[in-house]
Amino acid sequence: MAYVFEQMEATDYEKVNTKLKNRDSLDILRWANQTYGEKLVYACSFGAEAMVLLDLLSKIQKEAHILFLDTDFHFAETYELIERVKERYPTFRINMAKPALSPEEQAERYGDELWLKNPDQCCQIRKLDVLARELEPYDAWLSGLRREQSPTRANTEFVNQDKRFKKVKVCPLIHWTEEEIWMYIKLHQLPYNELHDQHYPSIGCTYCTKAVMPGEDARSGRWAGTGKTECGLHAPTKGDS
């Protein structure tokens, strides 16, 4: 069968995940590459998990499509890391996708500091709308989600029905622990965001990310004080598998 969103029912996801359940991350990437080919893209945050997934992906598809949601609000360290990734994996096709509105246009239309007044709307404009637009040519997208990251990610499967974007979402790292991620990074001497060494386990936009103190949840530095824990790219919707 064709593993595309429009042709797959919930039972089809169950079947393919049963088939793949004992495979490792490289096997999942091979399956995704063989299944989707040029219709597969990795929506990459360039976080710690991303460094592992990029390295694994380079062993399967050296000319993989990589999508970065360039909100215009990222840390300088994030942009510096992307340049290092380009040097290490020069054949990756990296798309730095920007929102329809510049920061100035957003401020003019919605007022200054939208990320404070309405963080959901800011994420919608600068991330979700961009991802929806950029995913159009593709049938499936890769993500570095891990089950242990948060309760909202605990039920993530290798192959997921993404009803928000109407695509198949493939997550090869669901069983990895944070310790394993960092062991792999150190073992293979991979580049990573220097902010990770400054108590930033999860890194997003400058205005919505702060350092996390020992004992705090790893994602507590994102949208701190707002009750918001996800930008919406991976927030589960009813009926998602």
From Swiss-Prot:
Gene3D superfamilies: HUPs (3.40.50.620). [4Fe-4S] cluster binds at C122, C123, C205, C208. Pathway: Sulfur metabolism; hydrogen sulfide biosynthesis; sulfite from sulfate. Its cofactor is [4Fe-4S] cluster. Its EC number is 1.8.4.10. It comes from Shouchella clausii (strain KSM-K16). Binds 1 [4Fe-4S] cluster per subunit. GO terms for molecular function: 4 iron, 4 sulfur cluster binding; adenylyl-sulfate reductase (thioredoxin) activity; metal ion binding; phosphoadenylyl-sulfate reductase (thioredoxin) activity. It comes from the Bacteria. InterPro entries: APS_reductase, PAPS/APS_Rdtase, PAPS_reduct_dom, Rossmann-like_a/b/a_fold. It holds the Pfam family PAPS_reduct. One of its GO terms (biological process) is hydrogen sulfide biosynthetic process. Belongs to the PAPS reductase family. CysH subfamily. Keywords: Cytoplasm, Iron, Iron-sulfur, Metal-binding, Oxidoreductase. It catalyses: [thioredoxin]-disulfide + sulfite + AMP + 2 H(+) = adenosine 5'-phosphosulfate + [thioredoxin]-dithiol. It is found in: Cytoplasm. This is Adenosine 5'-phosphosulfate reductase. The active site is at C231. NCBIfam families: APS_reductase (TIGR02055), cysH (TIGR00434), PRK02090.1 (NF002537). Catalyzes the formation of sulfite from adenosine 5'-phosphosulfate (APS) using thioredoxin as an electron donor. GO terms for cellular component: cytoplasm. Its main location: cytoplasm.
